[in-house]
Amino acid sequence: MIAAGDFRKGVTIEVDGQVFTVVDFMHVKPGKGAAFVRTKLKNVMTGAVIEKTFSPTEKFEEAVIERREMQYLYNDGELYYFMDTETYEQIPLNYDKVEDAIKYIKENMVVTVKFYKGEAFSVEPPTFVELEVVETEPGFRGDTATGGSKPATVETGAVIQVPLFINVGDKIRIDTRTGEYLERV
């Protein structure tokens, strides 16, 4: 059991028979009245985001989430196929289950797929990925006095802000939690 006052981003709970992940939360202490916790919850099966308010002492059952290492195989235009690295079982997932992660995933990359009661609901890429820049504007000397950034498209199609010295063909390391450039590899 977890109290609403202990919510953190990423915590998965059961509310009214459905499973939600806490996307955002805020402890509110009004001048008058009791404190409360305002949350944004994402339904893990449907992807719908709702806002709910709870008392900080209200308790919820934590949902048991199974995590499995799986290899991303390919996309057939509609579904994304992943293979369990231990059993070699393949599972297809539609776009709404992979939408946040797919911009950082290349074919054959190993990712974490989350399951609830045997059904896959989310894909988590590695925390740091190395991808090649396929399109960016050339950076010129003297463009700026204090550094700066420019947009760059990587091989998966994601657009990342990178320093001016990054060129097409460079491999860069990206933090998938924030989508930020970390370093040139």
Swiss-Prot record:
Pfam families: EFP (PF01132), EFP_N (PF08207), Elong-fact-P_C (PF09285). Gene3D superfamilies: 2.30.30.30, Nucleic acid-binding proteins. SMART domains: EFP, Elong-fact-P_C. One of its GO terms (biological process) is peptide biosynthetic process. One of its GO terms (cellular component) is cytoplasm. One of its GO terms (molecular function) is translation elongation factor activity. Belongs to the elongation factor P family. This is Elongation factor P. It comes from Thermoanaerobacter pseudethanolicus (strain ATCC 33223 / 39E) (Clostridium thermohydrosulfuricum).
